[in-house]
Design a protein with these regions (language model features):
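Single conserved hydrophobic/aromatic residue that forms the stacking wall/gate
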Residues: 141, 145-150
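Short beta->alpha junction loops
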Residues: 49-59
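Short acidic/histidine-rich motifs immediately flanking catalytic phosphotransfer sites
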Residues: 68-75
Length: 150
């Protein structure tokens, strides 16, 4: 009997709905839908079932994380600008019992100084940053590894 696919919630924060249009020199020309399609395909090969959500509202992200408890095996989050100040998202992720992977298309530590600190990192199993769209593929693999150790 085959193991059931692990359920992974993928959360994308503010302005990520504008990928492909907003600052393509930093974030590339692929849209969020492009990243989701590629990641979903790759995840299936790894035995993961992804469900994706994007919001420009921290309250909506917090409520989604609360609802994920007991439903999802892991969370992958690109918090966007919420990375640097959204303590409510930090606290919600801290209450989630599975692995959490923080992902960024760009490398925040090589950009403006205000982007260097993450309030999400302390509650994440790991962070993947700076690999463009490949970050979404890399994070699925890391989630599979992390979840086998929890």
């Amino acid at each position: 009997m085959a193991n059931a696919a692990k359920r992974v919630l993928v959360l994308n924060g503010p302005n990520l709905n504008l990928l492909g249009e907003r600052e393509p020199e930093i974030y590339g020309t692929a849209t969020l839908a492009d990243h989701v399609a590629a990641a979903t395909s790759q995840a299936a090969e790894l035995g993961l079932h992804l469900e994706n959500m994007q919001s420009n509202s921290s309250a909506e992200i917090v409520n989604t994380i609360h609802s994920a408890r007991g439903v999802y095996d892991a969370i992958i989050i690109n918090p966007g600008a919420f990375t640097h100040y959204a303590w409510s998202i930090h606290d919600a992720l801290a209450a989630f019992s599975g692995p959490v992977v923080e992902v960024h298309l760009s490398n925040p530590s090589t950009r403006e100084v205000w982007r260097h600190e993450s309030v999400i990192a302390p509650v994440a199993s790991g962070t993947i940053a700076g690999f463009g769209g490949s970050s979404y593929v890399l994070d699925r693999k890391s989630t599979r590894l992390n979840s086998s150790h929890t």
